[in-house]
Amino acid sequence: METIIPETETIDYLRQMKLTNIFPESINSLTNKEKKSENNIININSEVNFPQNNNIQSYKLEKNLKGKIKLNTKQLTSNNLAIEININYICSYNNILFIANNNELFLYDISDNYELYGKIKTPGEDKNILCLACTEFNDVLYCVMGGEFSSIHVIDVLAVQELTGYQLIGHKNKVYQLEFHPYNKNLLLSASKDCTVRLWNFKIPELLVIFGGPNSFESDVLCIDWDNKGEYFVGSGVDCVVRIYKIDKLIQDCINLSMGINNNMSKGKTKTLLKSLPYFSCNDIHDNLIDCIKYNNKFIISKSVDGVIKEWLPFKDINGQNSFFLINIFVFNTKQLILGIKFCFVDNNIVVGNEMGEIFLFNKEKSETSREVCEHNFFQNNYTQKIKIENNILLKNVHFNSFYNLIFFGGNTDEVYIYHLSKVINKDNK
């Protein structure tokens, strides 16, 4: 079954995924003639039952702060004016935590006492790092970073005392997000302010595909993510349109050709493809620009700058038109539109911060979000748990460690806050 499933298979898939609690029993009778809202959302107005799904884990954040990492950074200045500290990105690989603060990359060993492993600085005092991604290839740990310098830097983590490695050159403007393929670690996806997403074989290095042009992204692409099989990716941004691209046979042939090229062969063997028309697109999901998006199996979780997170299922109707089922809506406190607040999720739980130093945890099983969707009562705070760290701290970045027992928050201070994430035992599942 494809990631974008036909409407005739949508209900069966929802039942297979044990998500029938989202819809009433009468959903079996839904057809194309059923009433739909102006936003192409399936409306369900009958009573909804909420049976428990004991197979999905619930989590909670321990209220006491487990620890803090204080960055060893000097106050940066430009033209005698202090530059605001801004942790733009956090990621980890095994026991190494990567923290991007302005134009510096900090590496910490989080296996024991959070000791500083290394630090590097990007070329140019005013060129900030905006995104990171990590992968291990032939027993070498690589970190790639993008930002205001448009090129993508590839770093050998063992040589972090200086900016070594090479660059992927092709984007014409800022790079906002980087994502490695879930299985083929040669493949790197990048999203940019130049209105394109690009697919690279980062080990050659070679640009394989440009996703852009007519009928494609019309403005800055802020966020991307692969599906769990690496057969599709989703992207969105300033134009508020969600687009899904498929790795079709032509693209796969280009990938296979690049895999046969090594660094000793002459360049130019792989011709860069231009892919314009997406497999799926929809502009009815959010009312504001979308700055974070994630695949969750065949479902998509997306967030807009107005503090609204939606979970939805894309599908093709019987006429081949793009449509979607809205599964959940989560709303968290935000007093202003802030670009770049990221969320993360594990199992059935979503964690996000805001500009007031608050952490929100949403558990889809415990909330009655599905009922709110049915009643169109969207704009409520429906979080399962909220923790206050400190007033007026922008918690823009959130990241789980590899073992999903620690969660890291960072923003507009020189400190990263660490909380312990624990599983909640379901008494009915003993």
Annotate the PLM regions:
Residues 4-25, 53-82, 113-131, 160-177, ...:
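Inter-blade linker and blade-boundary elements of WD-repeat/beta-propeller domains
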Residues 77-104:
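Beta-strand-rich domains and repeat architectures in extracellular enzymes and scaffolds
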Residues 90-95, 133-140, 178-186, 225-231, ...:
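Loop/turn segments within WD40 beta-propeller blades
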Residues 100-102, 145-149, 190-194, 236-239, ...:
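Conserved strand-to-loop turn within each blade of WD40 beta-propeller repeats
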Residues 105-109, 152-157, 178, 197-202, ...:
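WD40-repeat beta-propellers
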Residues 221-244, 275-309:
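Repeat-solenoid scaffold signature
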Residues 307, 329-368:
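Loop/turn-rich, solvent-exposed surfaces of beta-rich toroidal or solenoidal domains
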Residues 399-430:
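Blade-level signature of beta-propeller repeat domains, shared across WD40, Kelch, NHL, RCC1
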